[in-house]
């Protein structure tokens, strides 16, 4: 993609777009919430559908000229239903947070109670953090992982639910490396008459491929984003039983959003179609294997992992034991200098600030898309360890940067 048309009218933006393409090709994207979509998805997202207003739903729009918008949305919905086995799917949310908003608006009144996973223990802002709309509209209490194991404590969660009597329990995570037992959370919700929303934003692709247990058919609502492990472009999705369909649809539009982003929905349709190919199951399995290999190799280098490992696409490193004087922010910055891009992250029982926390979160979806296998992931883990163990050593940085450049050349993303 040369951006010739952009360069003709706006060379500054063209330079930025070209620079970003080179950055993605020439660095290792290890932020757990990022991935590389296909050229086909990008082409769909840059289509003429960006020009089309299509308020409403297929067959019931508030504008004319929506026949092809209807075709695209119907394809996206049908493919999502096939992927996840869901009764009802809404593909209009602009993001995972918008999907969560749709569920809240469909089911809760201001002041209702939500029980969700604490942000520093792996939750997400939209699950009720005070800085987020959910924390401002609803009464929120939060459960935590077990202090010893770093894993969800389902018995403690149930006891918390019994005491708090929430209207909704939110499950799911942004930085929890273990498989979630949805049925146990559903049982806690059933015991107090609460609804259960499972947010699978990070593991949408793993669930679709059978690499993580599915909450579809267990939880009342399943939300997610479409640009992390499933590679369908930026956006959100809501799945539910048919009984909730009308409430969800009206909460998304007109409740929370106006016109849907039809060009993004086209990207979702294409990405979901790609995920229906058997090769996607192989990809998802490799994502999980690569994360396990990455974690094990880092442990061999003396690093401590939250929960002791991973079952998913991400590894959460707690630096306090191995490198107590180094923050996650320090590591993030130094690794980016050598071409490894990840993010600082809070860890359970965080002792630093959220702006400069004690951990780093590392994901494997994007590198797996590029073709990285277990051997390559061991090399990446070695590079990460060398930089952290030798913070500030420019000779080490130069050597690691050369290794990263070789890996990028060996596994190109966008030709």
UniProtKB/Swiss-Prot annotation:
Keyword Cytoplasm attached: yes
GO MF terms held by the record: glycine hydroxymethyltransferase activity; pyridoxal phosphate binding
Disulfide bonds: none
Residues carrying N6-(pyridoxal phosphate)lysine: 228
Biochemical pathway: One-carbon metabolism; tetrahydrofolate interconversion; Amino-acid biosynthesis; glycine biosynthesis; glycine from L-serine: step 1/1
Entry's localization field: Cytoplasm
GO BP: glycine biosynthetic process from serine; tetrahydrofolate interconversion; tetrahydrofolate metabolic process
UniProt keyword annotation of Repeat present: no
Assembly description: Homodimer.
Gene3D superfamilies according to UniProt: Aspartate Aminotransferase, domain 1, Type I PLP-dependent aspartate aminotransferase-like (Major domain)
Transmembrane segments: none
Catalytic activity: (6R)-5,10-methylene-5,6,7,8-tetrahydrofolate + glycine + H2O = (6S)-5,6,7,8-tetrahydrofolate + L-serine
Tree of life domain: Archaea
Matching Pfam families: SHMT
GO cellular component: cytoplasm
Cofactor: pyridoxal 5'-phosphate
Function text: Catalyzes the reversible interconversion of serine and glycine with tetrahydrofolate (THF) serving as the one-carbon carrier. Also exhibits THF-independent aldolase activity toward beta-hydroxyamino acids, producing glycine and aldehydes, via a retro-aldol mechanism.
Keyword vocabulary terms for this entry: Amino-acid biosynthesis, Cytoplasm, One-carbon metabolism, Pyridoxal phosphate, Transferase
Family: Belongs to the SHMT family.
Stated name of the protein: Serine hydroxymethyltransferase
Encoding gene (name): glyA
Enzyme Commission no: 2.1.2.1
Residues that coordinate or bind (6S)-5,6,7,8-tetrahydrofolate: 119, 123-125, 353-355
InterPro entries registered for this protein in UniProt: PyrdxlP-dep_Trfase, PyrdxlP-dep_Trfase_major, PyrdxlP-dep_Trfase_small, Ser_HO-MeTrfase, Ser_HO-MeTrfase-like, Ser_HO-MeTrfase_PLP_BS, SHMT-like_dom
């Amino acid at each position: 993609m040369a951006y010739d048309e952009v360069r003709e009218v706006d060379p500054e933006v063209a330079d930025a777009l070209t620079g970003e393409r080179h950055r993605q090709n020439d660095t290792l994207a290890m932020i757990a919430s990022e991935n590389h979509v296909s050229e086909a998805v990008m082409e769909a997202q840059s289509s003429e559908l960006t020009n089309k207003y299509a308020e409403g739903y297929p067959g019931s729009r508030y504008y004319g000229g929506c026949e092809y918008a209807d075709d695209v949305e119907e394809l996206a919905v049908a493919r999502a239903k096939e992927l996840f086995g869901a009764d009802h799917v809404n593909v209009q949310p602009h993001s995972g947070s918008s999907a969560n908003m749709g569920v809240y608006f469909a089911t809760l009144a201001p002041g209702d109670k939500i029980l969700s996973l604490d942000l520093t223990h792996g939750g997400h802002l939209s699950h009720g953090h005070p800085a987020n709309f959910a924390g401002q509209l609803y009464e929120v209490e939060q459960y935590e992982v077990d202090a010893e194991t770093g894993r969800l404590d389902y018995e403690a969660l149930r006891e918390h639910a019994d005491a708090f009597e929430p209207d909704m329990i939110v499950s799911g995570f942004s930085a929890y490396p273990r498989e979630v037992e949805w049925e146990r959370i559903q049982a806690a919700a059933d015991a107090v008459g609460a609804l259960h929303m499972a947010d699978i934003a990070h593991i949408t692709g793993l669930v679709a491929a059978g690499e993580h247990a599915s909450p579809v058919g267990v939880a009342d609502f399943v939300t997610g984003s479409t640009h992390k492990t499933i590679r369908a472009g930026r956006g959100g999705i809501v799945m539910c039983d048919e009984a909730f369909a009308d409430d969800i649809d009206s909460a998304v539009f007109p409740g929370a959003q106006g016109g849907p982003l039809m060009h993004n929905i086209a990207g979702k349709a294409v990405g979901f179609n790609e995920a229906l190919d058997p090769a996607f199951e192989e990809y998802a399995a490799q994502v999980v294997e690569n994360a396990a290999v990455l974690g094990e190799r880092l442990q061999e280098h003396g690093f401590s992992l939250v929960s002791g490992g991973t079952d998913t696409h991400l590894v959460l490193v707690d630096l306090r034991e191995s490198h107590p004087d180094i923050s996650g922010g320090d590591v993030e910055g130094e690794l980016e200098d050598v071409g490894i891009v990840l993010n600082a992250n809070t860890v359970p029982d965080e002792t630093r600030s959220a702006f400069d926390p004690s951990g780093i979160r590392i994901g494997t979806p994007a590198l797996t898309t590029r073709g990285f296998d277990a051997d390559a992931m061991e090399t990446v883990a070695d590079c990460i360890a060398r930089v952290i163990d030798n913070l500030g050593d420019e000779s080490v940085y130069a050597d690691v940067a050369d290794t990263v450049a070789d890996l990028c050349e060996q596994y190109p993303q966008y030709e």
